[in-house]
């Protein structure tokens, strides 16, 4: 089985006023991949000055890691009220170039953990998608503008980005931002073969093969930071093993519930 990969910027996250801690899609996705035992590779980027703080917690998860040095480290502050989140972008992370993708040649499925629109330009995604590689993009890479300050989503993304995407994962507010609704026609208009909309404790919606299917979830206690990243990683593990999209979402829902409840 060819390995799955997660690529993206690591971040420093401050949750509810606490001390900064490692974050970013690669870190949260790696937690799910470790639990599921799927051969995988993690490629990350951040400033070298933060390497000692960010890299060891990721390496301890047991997956091979490719480090790419950047000019900055993405830094965020979060606060939560149930499923509602307020977020402050303190510093943007670096952009990924085609050269940063070296070492991913054998990968079949790639989770692109964009934290902002500037992380993965269309040219970089086009390179990732070569050779029938399947690219799964986090909707943060469409809706989060490349500016610091309180996070305000918008739909000013480059449509060329979606030409290279096989799976698009959107949070509910991201879907509403870019297409206005979360219904079948709205998600179809994106032109992506598979679209998964996560609804927090209410589960998810899966659009695939022209049909929209709801996937329920049971509310789970725990810090939800990174739950979407873990969900997408678990979803891709099942898809790469031959499971259908809806079945993959159900399995991913169970994995996230286990991680939030610290049962896995």
Language-model segments: residues:
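Alpha-helix C-terminal capping segments
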Residues: 30-39, 238-241
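Conserved alpha-helical elements of sugar-nucleotide-dependent glycosyltransferases
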Residues: 24-25
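Conserved N-terminal subdomain of the carbohydrate kinase-like
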Residues: 2-3, 12-20, 35-114, 118, ...
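Short beta-strand/turn micro-motifs composed of small residues
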Residues: 8, 44-46, 139, 199
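Conserved phosphate-binding/catalytic region of the ribokinase-like
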Residues: 152-156, 183-264
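Active-site metal-binding loops of divalent metal-dependent hydrolases
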Residues: 8-10, 230
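Short beta-strand scaffold segments in enzyme catalytic cores
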Residues: 31, 76-79, 203-207
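Conserved beta-alpha-beta core of the PfkB/ribokinase-like small-molecule kinase fold
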Residues: 109-185, 203
């Amino acid at each position: 089985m060819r390995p799955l990969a997660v690529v993206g910027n690591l971040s420093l996250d401050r949750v509810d006023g606490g001390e900064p801690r490692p974050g970013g899609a690669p870190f949260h996705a790696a937690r799910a991949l470790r639990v599921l035992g799927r051969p995988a590779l993690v490629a990350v980027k951040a400033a070298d000055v933060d390497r000692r703080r960010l890299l060891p917690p990721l390496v301890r998860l047991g997956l091979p890691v490719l480090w790419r040095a950047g000019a900055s480290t993405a830094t965020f502050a979060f606060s939560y009220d149930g499923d509602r989140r307020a977020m402050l972008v303190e510093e943007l992370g670096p952009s990924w170039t085609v050269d940063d993708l070296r070492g991913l040649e054998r990968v079949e499925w790639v989770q692109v953990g964009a934290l902002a629109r500037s992380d993965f330009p269309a040219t970089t995604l086009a390179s990732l998608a070569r050779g029938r590689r399947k690219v799964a993009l986090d909707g943060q890479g469409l809706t989060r503008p490349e500016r610091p300050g309180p996070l305000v989503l918008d739909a000013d993304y480059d449509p060329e980005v979606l030409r290279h995407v096989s799976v698009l994962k959107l949070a509910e507010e991201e879907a509403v931002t870019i297409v206005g609704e979360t219904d079948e026609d709205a998600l179809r208009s994106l032109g992506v073969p598979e679209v998964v909309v996560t609804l927090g404790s209410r589960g998810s919606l899966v659009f695939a093969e022209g049909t929209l299917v709801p996937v329920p979830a049971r509310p789970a206690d725990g810090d939800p930071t990174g739950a979407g990243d873990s969900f997408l990683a678990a979803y891709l593990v099942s898809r790469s093993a031959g499971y259908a999209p809806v079945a993959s979402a159900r399995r991913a829902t169970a994995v996230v519930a286990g991680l939030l409840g610290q049962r896995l």
